Amino acid sequence: MKPCQKMEGNLEKEDEPKPEEEPKPEEKPEEGQEPEEEEKSEETFRERLIRSLQDFQEDIHNRHLSSDDLFRDVEELDEIRKVRNKLIVTRWKANRSHPYPYLM
């Protein structure tokens, strides 16, 4: 046998896939535990959802807004809108490369 044939034979043996070692049974997670954990997390999620819904309903019933509070909120929104529009116009005046802005 020629030396080159010996080398080719060695290469062929190295290319053969080696069987992968399976993890030991201790390392494998048991399938029975996963659904229980999912159920627990689901239950806690449902409980939290129900609790938050109850808190929200209580908050809505306890919140009685007077007309003064509503008018004050509307006035604040109007003031915010005016300031926003002023800023938009000033920016537009500084940089007129785009069309006139839409104001609210």
Curated annotation (Swiss-Prot):
GO CC terms in record: nucleus
Ranges annotated as biased composition (Acidic residues): 32-41
Region (Disordered): 1-48
Chief place where the protein resides: nucleus
Alphabetic keyword roster: Nucleus, Transcription, Transcription regulation
Subcellular location: Nucleus
Transmembrane regions: none
Feature: compositional bias, Basic and acidic residues: 9-31
MF terms (GO), sorted A to Z: WW domain binding
Keyword field contains Thylakoid: no
Family per similarity comment: Belongs to the TFS-II family. TFA subfamily.
Job of this protein: May be involved in transcriptional regulation.
Name of this chain's protein: Transcription elongation factor A protein-like 9
Organism: Mus musculus (Mouse)
